[in-house]
Amino acid sequence: MTINFLIAPDFPPEYYAGWHFLNTRLQRLIDAPVHLSMASNAEEEQQEIDKDNVDIIYANPFNASKLIRELDYLPVVKPVNCFDEMIIASSADSEIKSLADIKPGMSILCTENYDVKLIALRLLEAVDIDEKDLTWIKSESFAAVARGLIQKQGNIGLFMSSAYHKLTAITRSRLNLLIESKINDLYHLILLHPRNAEMLENLQNAFSTMRDTPAGEMLLEDLGLNDGFEVLKKEDVELLIDLIETLRD
């Protein structure tokens, strides 16, 4: 039986090859066929979940929390020292130089990443801005958010920190970083569908030992996962879910 492994649509295209290399190594470690899928957007990701096509998923913390609570997905591993932070930015030649310069009625470029938006809204509370005060403009990718800011299609833009720092130096020089979150408790998780519960320990061993060889270390570094994965403890999961609920309130 082939196992279906879905990757959240949160990563730049240059990571695609790296995920396929990781999947090849995973198949060797667990001695089972694994079919890798890269969701192109949040809607496609949800469709695969709704169709019950997902056995393993690398999900953002907000989706992971929902999958654990509502569909009984099992936590497998989390990346070590790799947190989900976000950045609010403006165009370098914009008059917006700090959060205090953001005013009601301004437009904001963002992707479908709900986690990025939710963290941004919490940061904007500091300057008395809430969701209804802004005009939200959907962008297909973080690169598109950057282009939109440079082309004056929006006043501010939202990025995953990892995506922002992967932009070219020239692109970043044309942007102004207003604020970067420092939560340090949010991270993507690898989850397992409960119907595959018998695979849990095998998967945990495979992911947590992937960095133990030079080849494994190299492929993880190519994905920005320099310190590899570690098995999730029960208290880690409980803390993450509590934090998600706090951010949503």
Question: Model segments located where?
Answer:
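Short hydrophobic/aromatic-enriched beta-strand-loop microsegments
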Residues: 74-79, 131-136, 157, 176-180
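A ligand-binding cleft/hinge motif common to bilobed small-molecule-binding domains
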Residues: 58-70, 148-174
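Bilobed "Venus flytrap"/periplasmic-binding protein-like clamshell domains
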Residues: 3-29, 85-146, 162
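Acidic, polar ligand-binding/catalytic clefts
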Residues: 47-101
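Short helix-initiation/N-cap motifs at beta->coil->alpha
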Residues: 36-47, 132-147, 184-185
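Periplasmic-binding protein-like
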Residues: 1-9, 81-90, 172-210, 225-243
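N-terminal hydrophobic or amphipathic helices and topogenic motifs
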Residues: 1-53, 59-62, 215-249
